[in-house]
Amino acid sequence: MTTHSMSRREFARLFAMGGSAAILSHQTLLGSKPVRMTDPITSAGTVDWKTIRSQFLMPPELTVLNAANLCPSPAPVLETVYNYTKRLDSKPLPSFRAEMREVKEKTRQQLAKYLRVTPEEILITRNTSESNNWVSNGLDLRAGDEVVIFSDNHPSNNEAWKERGKRFGFTVNEVLPLNPHPGFDYYLEAFKKALTPRTRVLSFTHLSNTVGDLFPAKELCGMARKRGIITLIDGAQSLGLLDVDLSDIQPDFYSGSAHKWPCGPKETGVLFVNKSLQERFWPSIYSAYKGREGLAQTHEGLGQRDTPAIHAFGQQIEFLRKIGQEKIEERSGDIATEIIEELQKTKGVYIFTSNERALRSAVVTFRPANLEPAKVVKALEEDGIVATNLGGDDWAGVRFSPHFYNSNSDVERAVGAIRRYLRKGL
């Protein structure tokens, strides 16, 4: 395997750092990285992707292709978490805690603007898993009711419905995936056939975390709405990657996390709850320090929160808006296209992800001939390339999920490594 200037021990140390870890070794962690968001737009109106990449702590010799699992945060996000935590711990005055509650409301407004909805419809959660569970726990479902799910949803979505079905007696029916992506019409028809007069909820992923299949969210929500069926979109793989306009898609619920594609602080997330459904949605937790806007007044009582992280989440959302979410979606999709095109030239590689741009985005999963995916991912890590392996019978393979901070050279390094392993072995 190739040797890089960064040792494996150093790589492991850097990779393990994240979020509030900045507090532990502040100067070492930030180094010479900027502590204010640098304007990524040039005088010509184009995006300077190199400037954006420079704001992340990742060393040049590290290629991170794992956005579908965990994205690094830029240095200014870590600086915000550090500064506000230090201030709170230095002088934990009641006035400052009140100020931090105002900061949470500002983040709510930023999220609402980003998703094109109202602040009254935004709940700030800890991640997609919590958001999904709030939904499955907060709806009145009983014996005889049915919930339709996509079987390739994340476990935090599917398992929650199944376990509550056992408890309350409702039935959970699944729509199975088909590979390669059969097209939007196929899935619209498959979900339509699964709906019955007893169906109360339709829960599906916006973009699958396995092979990166994109789903016709607006059309599925419209179909369900005509039948009086509640919709939950798991947006863990679309928030921060796709240009999500919930005012256009019109779901009843939409969940997402900051730690993936938004590149935000860890353990912050969002749940959108459509105004039309709020009276039918019960809180899952009752405690203090609720929000001030809309549904947050009753549903966001989680007690003490990591308010510095919530503040940093809002700042990162503003940074994404400054770049332009449509440009981020295009950039990430272009890099994924390049990965697919290069893998197609590689003998022995089978690509699970659709080659058709309209049916996917930036999640690329492939089988590297007869090599064991877990061993391939381990070899990639030793070569300074971060990826994920998927298990199971259906999608056993390696997953590359590039983001806007990646470049063509990252594609060359990653695909070059795969070709080398196939040629020489692991």
Regions of interest found by a model, annotated:
Residues 2, 7-426:
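Pyridoxal 5′-phosphate
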